[in-house]
């Protein structure tokens, strides 16, 4: 990775075309069954919306609407003008899929819920750069805690869609608690 040509931009109306190019393109070439998500899963209240019935077209439209209304947040890694990575990170109160998992001081918690790096660019440190940008962005919004839910036993890139546990631990996150499904919650003070 050339550090001089890699940049990270926050999702916005202006950067939305980069997000769409990445998600419409080869981002999921090694995991096509998830290509319909457009990082909308955590924005939905699953008591209201049946996620399994949400189509790619619907999710793409919702991503556009939410990005334009500043109700969806995340960071896009660009190599020049080519999108090569994505990190979904937002204040917890925007992520309605987490509504049934209350946490103390939720208004101060930013959740990192998605990592996606172009398959041909994995292992180059792009996720680390995205994680730093996500933490900086959450801090700038007044969040005092960054939280994520990685899978310790991840065997594939798809299993690491919340980000690799090793990435978080090497970036100053610590295990906050274990979940019944074998995953862990990690946190970092911002």
Predicted regions and their residues:
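Conserved N-terminal entry element of GNAT/NAT acetyltransferase domains
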Residues: 1-46
């Amino acid at each position: 990775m050339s550090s001089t040509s890699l940049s990270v931009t926050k999702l916005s109306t202006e950067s939305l075309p980069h997000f769409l190019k990445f998600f419409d393109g080869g981002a999921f070439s090694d995991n096509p069954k998830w290509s319909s998500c457009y990082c909308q899963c955590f924005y939905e209240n699953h008591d209201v919306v049946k996620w399994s019935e949400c189509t790619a077209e619907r999710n793409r439209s919702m991503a556009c609407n939410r990005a334009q209304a500043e109700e969806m947040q995340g960071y896009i890694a660009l190599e020049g003008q080519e999108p090569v990575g994505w990190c979904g990170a937002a204040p917890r109160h925007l992520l309605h899929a987490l509504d049934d998992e209350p946490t103390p001081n939720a208004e101060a918690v930013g959740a990192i819920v998605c990592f996606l790096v172009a398959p041909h660019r994995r292992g180059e440190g792009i996720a680390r750069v995205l994680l730093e940008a996500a933490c900086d962005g959450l801090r700038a919004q007044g969040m005092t805690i960054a939280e994520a839910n990685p899978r310790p036993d991840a065997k594939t890139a798809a299993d690491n869609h919340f980000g690799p546990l090793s990435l978080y631990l090497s970036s100053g996150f610590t295990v906050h608690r274990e979940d019944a499904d074998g995953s862990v919650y990690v946190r970092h003070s911002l």
